[in-house]
Amino acid sequence: MCIRDSSTSVNIWRKQSADSNLVTSSSAVIALGSNIGDRMSYLRFACDSFDRKLKISSIYETEPIGGPSDQDAYLNLVLSIETSLDPHALLRKCQRIEGGAARQRTIRWGPRTLDVDILFYEGCLIESELLTIPHPSINERRFVLTPLSEIHPELCPANWSETLDPEEIKLFGSIDESH
């Protein structure tokens, strides 16, 4: 069950178990992307940083959307995890993972060693300055929806593949394959 956190002025919903002393785990869906350096190694690093992986999609290669025109192609995947972290603690973990890959935040939609985004967090809707769940741009991003549809098609909007502008997206492989 999720309850509204009235201690803040933002709309945050927290998962609570019937026994409030019990630490619960929740599932979350994470998107990963990389377009600088050894892209596969950065994706592996991020995947390895999550202890309890439930599902991992295939990896897709796409051209960048927005930002500088001279960027290299991205590798993208989506994974679902089980976590005992609350959504904001999970966000901090995602940012630490990006930092561990030497992520630099210099240009909006610019090239990056690693991008780690929380798409969904089980049973929670959050809208704050720091975090919005579900991710606000998910329905506009074929590079997220294609891998998401592999592991959680129920989370994709109806007819998304027909309504989004087609962009080139190529199946690249899986996280277990060597490239």
Positions of PLM-derived features:
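Conserved small/polar residues in nucleotide/adenosyl-binding loops
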Residues: 1-6
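Compositionally biased regions
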Residues: 7-10, 18-21, 175, 179
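N-terminal beta1-alpha1 ligand-phosphate binding loop
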Residues: 12-51, 56-64
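Flexible, gly/pro- and Lys/Arg-enriched active-site loops
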Residues: 13, 57-75, 88-179
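Short beta-strand-to-loop capping motifs
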Residues: 34, 79-83, 120-123
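Hydrophobic alpha-helical segments and helix-packing faces
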Residues: 36-39, 43, 68, 72, ...
